[in-house]
A protein has these predicted regions:
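Internal alpha-helical scaffold of NAD(P)-dependent oxidoreductase catalytic cores
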Residues: 60-61, 84-89, 104-174
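Short, conserved catalytic or adaptor-binding loops enriched in Gly and charged residues
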Residues: 18-24, 134-137
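Extended, non-catalytic scaffold segments that flank or surround catalytic motifs
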Residues: 2-3, 43
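Structured helix-beta-strand junction loops
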Residues: 10, 64-65, 139
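Short secondary-structure capping/turn micro-motifs that flank functional sites
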Residues: 3-5, 24, 99, 152-153
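Rossmann-like NAD(P)(H) cofactor-binding subdomain of soluble oxidoreductases
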Residues: 21-106
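Glycine-rich phosphate-binding loop and adjoining beta1-alpha1-beta2 segment
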Residues: 3-22
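Short, charged/polar "capping" segments at the starts of alpha-helices
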Residues: 3-6, 78-79, 126
Length: 174
């Protein structure tokens, strides 16, 4: 759609934060996952109501060693994804970010406090987790790989639940 065309036309995705502006320049911009081929990691970032459709769309990128990291809000997201992808490794994760698509090709962040937590759920870090943490850090992302990822997911779930209740009760945005 218009977002994809704007990214292609600008040679990247423009990101505006309170402290900086930059153009993220991905090596591949497509709406066809089959063009990408199999990958090592998939960051699955969509809304809960689009999970089933999204899983169907990413299937061409899933190989024998692919790790999927869903970053949807909710306490049971990884478990639900595993029902769609029983033969694929699905990790757990959550992010704290306040961002929106302001216009085609433009993402606006409201704060400079982005946090990214992920993990396999195993008691020890795997080599693949260490590798992803290094890749994210090299890209300037504050990524953390705690062994107790479920605690971080539940903490965010509780924060969202309280916030959603308050905004619904008072009929006000955050």
């Amino acid at each position: 759609g218009a977002h994809l065309e704007a990214i292609r036309a600008a040679g990247g995705l423009r990101v505006v934060t309170p402290s900086r502006d930059f153009l993220a320049r991905p090596t591949c911009v497509t709406d066809n996952p089959a063009e990408v081929g199999t990958v090592d990691y998939i960051l699955f970032c969509t809304k809960d109501y689009d999970m089933e459709r999204g899983v169907a769309e990413i299937r061409p990128m899933i190989g024998q060693n692919t790790k999927i990291l869903p970053l949807l809000n909710g306490a049971d997201i990884a478990e639900r994804m595993r029902t769609y992808l029983p033969d694929t490794v699905v990790w757990k994760g959550c992010v704290y970010i306040s961002a929106r698509k302001s216009a085609p090709g433009l993402i606006t962040l409201e704060a400079d406090r982005e946090l990214f937590y992920f993990g396999s759920g195993l008691p020890e870090q795997t080599d693949d987790e260490v590798r992803l943490a290094e890749l994210l850090t090299a890209a300037g992302i504050r990524a953390y790989n705690p062994t107790d990822i479920d605690w971080y997911i539940m903490k965010k779930f509780m924060m969202i639940s309280v916030t959603a209740t308050a905004t619904a009760y008072f009929d006000k945005p955050i």
